[in-house]
Amino acid sequence: MTRKKEPFIVVEIEKRMYNDFKDLYNTNRDGIYRGVLDIYTEFKNNSRKRVLTLLVSTDMGVLSWDTEFSFKKLDYQILIKQILPYYEDNEDYEKCAEIKNLHDYFANIN
């Protein structure tokens, strides 16, 4: 019998009614993206890890919703393609610098 691994990061989303998944995602994108950044920071700090899981969990009134996202160390392009534009749009340039540094670290070791 195999035992399921616990997720590395759990993002608990505020309990409330969302119109749909897009509403849930857009409302909570910052917390989800910070979880992704924590995962890539862990990859940087622990070179042995290759895959880490982010669990996004919420209760939407009539439905409990738990979804796991697995991230591979080699898929670091998500930092530039998905995460960075969000923080650029919100003018959080300190976070942009952190993201760029993480991306450059992985680009240089591969």
Q: Where are the regions that the model predicts?
A:
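Long, acidic/serine-threonine-rich intrinsically disordered regions with weak helical/coil propensity
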Residues: 1-24
